[in-house]
């Protein structure tokens, strides 16, 4: 689970202002079957939504997710002691997934997705660089078309596509999706006042 360093511009039709869409990438470990999703931020909410969209794309849930140490997933990761973002941990509990963040400065822990990100930059993002997008939905439509092509392309080493390898190697071991999709929650620490009221977002 990772984000691409390359982004795609989104143009506001009314103002002409340009924002940078963030490109989320997941790669399944055995098959290399890849999912790509664009969002406007790398916020916890957008990150979790992209993770869940990946589960629905795959049609199931893996045993383990290996995210990078971005704040949307990991609060701290020092000397083997990991503190996950509360919302991300809550999502993982909902789907019964273990989260094992990559160790800081150990790129081999997520080498599969790093290779996947580079391939996606080359096969998808570079092909979209001369397109103009006015919203992220338009961008995701085009990404999905190219993603199908990418996953169906033969992997020379195996003489099979990532889609074929997925059906053989990963799909049989995915856990079924929960009947109810996870609903994002924000977790906040609050102090109870002497009047027993709790203040949230500045409102008593």
Annotated model-derived regions:
Residues 36-60:
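Active-site beta-loop-alpha junctions of metal-dependent nucleic acid enzymes
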Residues 60-80:
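Acidic/histidine-rich, metal-coordinating catalytic segments
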Residues 67, 79, 99-121, 139:
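RNase H-like two-metal-ion nuclease catalytic core shared by retroviral integrases
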Residues 89, 93-110, 129-131:
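RNase H-like polynucleotidyl transferase catalytic core
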Residues 117, 121-204:
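Active-site-proximal acidic segments at structured loop/helix or strand boundaries
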